[in-house]
């Protein structure tokens, strides 16, 4: 029987997409698909092969998403019903598309079909100028592909890079790198926000109490303390708290014996020396002067730390590499370098880096012939 002379329905010439395939299409391709499918339905109806309006056409006319489940697709239902009367049976009882590896390869065909928007209009529009209605079958996804980059079923082929990988790649391309620590950021605003960690800038101030914060999210979290209900009240001073454990922590101020109280702000101290050091904050007095540069300091400890700048003393020495530091903070940061794994290793000289920005900057020295 000549297949070209069979009565053709819209179901024979329609294209059906699954949810995953529909998500791969561009908006322009979706609009093209809608126009082509509605034109094909009009052509079928105009030639007298009219049938009840398909659900796919109704969805397209109402601008709804036309994807269907796999069990609703014609090729799936054809397998469930068996071959049509008079159709040729395959010599191989097991279809190759039923193999798991073949089903895996079909994902490549779907992606290629989604990228070729013109294939909709070229392969699936019905031509009725000569009065004949050809059977325009959609491109079969179970047709044997020519080549695939992956041959192993367990391989994670075609995996799109994750959000973190794309962000790092974009940071390297745009060179949003912190000059202090070498960390790479995805945009200029993130770089500016990150640099406040090094500068100590706190640009967000609470209008209620004046407390400053480095991040806007911390300010918003803090402002809830002013608006939320505070049912736990201190019997000694009347200060209220939103949490019971905060009240218990506050009560220690009243129970601990602090005989030395500041006359300016009321803050109490256990030792008189601590009170005298605190009062310098109110008076602004700096009694300790550097003999080399004349700079004044509030405490003797701060003066001794400053004098290391002139003497060159570096009392903090790393036991791993022997590097010395003047300040304990810099020494503690350096020790983390030995404890933290260095993820980025240079293939030319073997030098390791913790941050992608420093690693990228180092590789440029090899390209420019500086190393």
Swiss-Prot record:
Q: Which GO terms describe its biological process?
A: regulation of transcription by RNA polymerase II
ZnF endpoints (C2H2-type): 176-198, 204-226, 232-254, 260-282, 288-310, 316-338, 344-366
Locations listed in the record: Nucleus
Molecular function per GO:
DNA-binding transcription factor activity; RNA polymerase II cis-regulatory region sequence-specific DNA binding; zinc ion binding
| One GO cellular component term | nucleus
Ranges of Basic and acidic residues composition bias in the record: 89-98, 113-128
Identify the stretch annotated as signal peptide in this record.
none
Q: Which residues form the KRAB domain?
A: 8-79
> Does the record's keyword annotation contain Nucleus?
yes
Q: Which UniProt keywords apply?
A: DNA-binding, Isopeptide bond, Metal-binding, Nucleus, Repeat, Transcription, Transcription regulation, Ubl conjugation, Zinc, Zinc-finger
Q: Where is this cross-link: Glycyl lysine isopeptide (Lys-Gly) (interchain with G-Cter in SUMO2)?
A: 144
The record's section on InterPro entries has: KRAB (IPR001909), KRAB_dom_sf (IPR036051), Znf_C2H2_sf (IPR036236), Znf_C2H2_type (IPR013087)
Bias category Basic residues: which stretches?
A: 102-112
Report the superkingdom from the record: Eukaryota
> Which stretches does the entry tag as region Disordered?
71-143
Q: Which family does it belong to?
A: Belongs to the krueppel C2H2-type zinc-finger protein family.
| Primary role | May be involved in transcriptional regulation.
- Identify this protein by name: Zinc finger protein 707
Q: Which organism is it from?
A: Homo sapiens (Human)
